[in-house]
Amino acid sequence: MLSSNTRGDCSDTAEEMTVDSRDSKDLSAQDIGEQKQQQMEDQLEDQLNDSRDPQNNNNNIDDDADEDAEFEEPEKANPQQDQDLGETEMEQEHDLQQEDLQQELPANSPSTPPRSPSSPQLIPKLEQPATPPSEPEASPCPSPSPCPTPKYPKVRLNALLASDPALKPDAKELTLPDSRLLAPPPLVKPDTQAQPEVAEPLLKPARFMCLPCGIAFSSPSTLEAHQAYYCSHRIKDTDEAGSDKSGAGGSGATAGDAAGLTGGSTEPPAKMARTGKQYGCTQCSYSADKKVSLNRHMRMHQTSPAAPTLAGLPSLLQNGIAPPGVTPNPMEDSSSQQTDRYCSHCDIRFNNIKTYRAHKQHYCSSRRPEGQLTPKPDASPGAGSGPGSAGGSIGVSAQAATPGKLSPQARNKTPTPAMVAVAAAAAAAAASLQATPHSHPPFLALPTHPIIIVPCSLIRAASFIPGPLPTPNSGIVNPETTCFTVDNGTIKPLATALVGATLEPERPSAPSSAAEATEAKSSPPEPKRKEAGLTRESAPLDLSLRRSPITLNSLSLRQRQLRNALLDVEEVLLAGVGTGKENVETPRGGGSVTPEQIVCAPSLPSSPSMSPSPKRRAISPRSSGAGSASSMSPPGLNVAVPHLLDMRSMLPADFGLSESLLAKTNPELALKLAAAAAAAAVAGSSGAAAFPPASLPAQTSSGNPGSGGSAGGAQQPQIYVKKGVSKCMECNIVFCKYENYLAHKQHYCSARSQEGASEVDVKSAVSPSIAGAGGLGAGAAEAASSVETTPVAYQQLICAACGIKYTSLDNLRAHQNYYCPKGGAVAAPAATPTDPGQLGMPKEKCGKCKTLHEIGLPCPPPVANPLAAPTVNPQPATNSLNKCPVCGVVSPTAALAKKHMEMHGTVKAYRCSICQYKGNTLRGMRTHIRTHFDKKTSDVNEELYMTCIFEEDASALSQELVTPTGASTTTGHDSMDHPSQMFNCDYCNYVSTYKGNVLRHMKLMHPHVAINSPSISPDTRDQDVTSNPTTNQHSNSDVSNGEAPSFHIKSEPLDPPPTVNLVHENNNSPIATPHIKAEPIEVGADAAPGGLVPPMTSPLGNSSSVAAAAAAAAEVMKKYCSTCDISFNYVKTYLAHKQFYCKNKPIRPEASDSPSPNHLGGGVAVGLGIGGLVGGHGQQKNKENLQEAAI
């Protein structure tokens, strides 16, 4: 009775406050009509509640006196402080007092009944600052029925005149209701109930305070939100337990009684009391804890509040009013309406159905894992024992039948009848699993890809949908055999039915017994994920796996489906063999596979692992081999799928490769190679045609290599598998022979300066004869056997297009699919015996010929004509665009080539083998080498004419350059290590690769002789080399096997007109010869060596000849800069050079016009005795050669 009276008092107070809040605003005529109608309804409710308890006023008068004493001081101060306050502040004060009373009464009514005041006593206290002097007459009124009648007009009048200063004295007189202290004595209660009253006044000022946190709030809704979401002391289990009790019907009491039953601490009763006082809108799902807020909300609908209808029954049930004659079906309808706009996953209520749909489509937390359009059925918590309890369906049915006894959130989560049926079927299946733990429920395996396994119990709740489905996906091949799923209102394809012929290969490999078949079907995690509505596109990303390279354009949709279906079936079969499957509990141990365990399995069937992680290899045998057919096998394989494929032979799991070192180091590659070889053998194509030696075609086109042979392989980027017994970790090179590895570590490794040659990987040395196969073999069948028997320790995967090496297959696939500059357009040809420079073969740099070829083979003959080289070598010249001259690695860009050359730390410079030009960059050397050829063609392979200068070569050079003959350091350095065509001086040991330099040298150093063309034939050069031991020392290393390569080098136009003399009186007169840039003069020695210069035995012979020769020599030397080693055609050009550009710019350029004594001494001395040796014919020839040298 006390609880019902308390509800009546709270509703009276709430209705009075509603009137005050309405009258405190400017109301229209329609609002006034609403007020009158609401007042009439409240009067009827008050009369009914007061007639039930006529003694309510006499029970709690003493307690009301105490409360009045507490409120007395603030009420005295209010008229003075709030003199200038507007109507809004009055309304806020009324609302605050109303909320305080609503908070106190339901919480204290079960424990302390005398503290619940009656409605006639609360009315003047709440309206005390604005009540007229006649208000105290209503407080001692014993009969409750006449009290509300004169109350409303006075309240309305005082609310409008609250700011009138003329009524302040009256308001002060009314703040002293001393007469109420003389009310009849209250009902005496035991002392045990009066003890909590001592602590109550301390808690009253913080009526909206979170006790654990100590934070006060201005409204109970804010406090409730804080306690539900933000409070650090909230206990989720307690809240769920409270909702479970209310859902299962365990407490059978109302919200007010539940607050008293769960007492023990003061916080839970406050929460339960607030959750029960919700004012719900009759036209939408809006609810508020204050009726004032609900009235404001009702104005949005622009309709007057009608009488309580069936749609308003939930709000009446929350307020404690029991409407008569209510059937449960309309209640379910109203709850389903609220469920349509309530998201149970996020616990958010929406006012608009459009907002709700937008939330479910874009923002809901369930769209990724489940994507359901309806809320989750909370049936299992109601049973209290999990999903496997037998009472799950009972709890669901009770929850659906009595939504009025639930809290608002629990009531809004009430499932629909279809959801109840599905949950009941699932609970029945779980109960049957618990009843018979060793017997498994029957499942239905649908012949789709992926295979969908559905429990038979779910068929009971299935419904029939006639006609075609309105799907926007027009790209579906066979819509009549496609399974769909509804995801956020859109229909998406889930699985596709398999063709009947493709199901035949699965039967021989399936287990024979029915128990093993049931175990294989229920073990994989895939079917339950499909049952829960998870598609492959909406599944969360599993970062523990790496997806296989995307080859959407390689195969058609049907071919991929057939292949993946076979792989999925193979995964089911191999699941019983492999142990340690993550998060999957197989029924072999006696346990049951619950839906929770299956859903939480992390592995994705559509993304086989491509990483060489040992953990993934040990967990799943399919992690390496499952994706091999889709990424490695040829497309023509699907032609013979129905009757030829046996997946177990195509996927020899870890137990089949236990003896192989390849399986131990990288079983992923072994499985892929074995799968590709077996696929080629099944397809009926020869291994040499479909799989070239040491190469694997990638599936990037929809061609048929089984029928096309090598022609189809030429259109696809290939992979060269280089396998060996040793690997240099610093240079990332795999060696087929251990001897080559030792030679590399001793002579060529970039880390040989830090590590000694003895620190080698001895444990990696396996028999070189076994590792000599180096690939898949000649045929595919031999390749499959070699994968299992060849004990190779290392393998490298080389991109055939650009030559970059990789140790992981997925990295190589990603490179070929996205980054390879030549993989998309032009594929590299297969390795043939006629191509010795193919990257698939192990090559080393030969110390004799300085070229890359296989160790043990004779040095290749030099190319006679570089322009004809492309006709001999079918390999495109673009493959060697950035080829490393040291190790032969081809880089796609110049920047990568430069970075690669940094690995070879001992390479100091590069030298042109044609002219001995030395450069520091590869790009500059390639540009320089192209200047030697007439045509600027792209067929020139610059690496053939480029050699490297190593650090040890420079140190050896410094020792060899000390010669007793005084030869030039530049000459000795230039002629080292390079097989090139040289031009020799006939009278000394001067050698140069430019003919003009030799002519200039002969003119300057030997002007006494008739200057002929220098010796350019190899025979003449060999004689000169033999006559000079110092030059022979360097040139022996240049010529390999007694052969000197000949080059087609562009010739300079050196034939001048014979009638033009070199020396002119007027230096400004033009010379009728082509202007060609003069080459630097390489002076062999400051003075001609003794024995080669003719002795000056004759005095002045022919004075005219001597004078002419001396004048010519002086004229030539007048235009020669010895500092920069440049000769000029004109004196003015020479003077400008000396003044502005010379390294040694003197103050007076004229002082340097005379020839240098060092260079002229020999010439003058020779000129003094030249008359007796040279005749008239020699003088004429000398002039022509001087003119040629000057040019």
UniProtKB/Swiss-Prot annotation:
GO terms for biological process: amnioserosa maintenance; cell differentiation; chaeta development; compound eye development; germ-band shortening; heart development; larval lymph gland hemopoiesis; lymph gland crystal cell differentiation. Residues 383-394 have a biased composition (Gly residues). Zn(2+) 3 binds at residues 728, 731, 744, 749. A zinc finger (C2H2-type) spans 279-301, 882-907, 910-932, 983-1006. Pfam families: zf-met. Keywords: DNA-binding, Metal-binding, Nucleus, Phosphoprotein, Repeat, Repressor, Transcription, Transcription regulation, Zinc, Zinc-finger. Changing residue 231 to A: Abolishes interaction with GATA-type zinc fingers. A zinc finger (CCHC FOG-type) spans 202-235, 335-368, 720-753, 791-824, 1113-1146. Residues 254-266, 509-523, 602-613, 620-635 have a biased composition (Low complexity). It is found in: Nucleus. Residues 1025-1040 have a biased composition (Polar residues). The modification Phosphoserine is found at residues 116, 118, 1013, 1015, 1017, 1156. First expressed in stage 5 at high levels in the primordium of the amnioserosa. Also expressed in germ band extending embryos in cells of the developing anterior and posterior midgut and in hemocyte precursors present in the cephalic mesoderm. In embryonic stage 8, it is expressed in blood cell precursors. By stage 10, it is expressed in hemocyte precursors that have spread throughout the lateral and ventral head mesoderm. By stage 11, it is expressed in the dorsal ectoderm and in precursor cells of the hemocytes and fat body. GO terms for molecular function: DNA binding; DNA-binding transcription repressor activity; RNA polymerase II-specific DNA-binding transcription factor binding; zinc ion binding. Its main location: nucleus. Changing residue 1142 to H: Transforms the C2HC-type zinc finger into a C2H2-type, leading to abolish interaction with pnr. Zn(2+) 4 binds at residues 799, 802, 815, 820. It comes from the Eukaryota. Interacts with pnr, although weak this interaction is essential. Interacts with the isoform SrpNC of srp. Interacts with CtBP corepressor. Belongs to the FOG (Friend of GATA) family. Transcription regulator that modulates expression mediated by transcription factors of the GATA family such as pnr and srp. Represses transcription of proneural achaete-scute complex (AS-C), which is usually activated by pnr. Involved in cardiogenesis, blood, and eye development. During hematopoiesis, it is required to restrict the number of crystal cells, probably via its interaction with the isoform SrpNC of srp. Negatively regulates expression of sr. The CCHC FOG-type zinc fingers 1, 4 and 5 directly bind to GATA-type zinc fingers. The Tyr residue adjacent to the last Cys of the CCHC FOG-type zinc finger is essential for the interaction with GATA-type zinc fingers. This is Zinc finger protein ush. It comes from Drosophila melanogaster (Fruit fly).
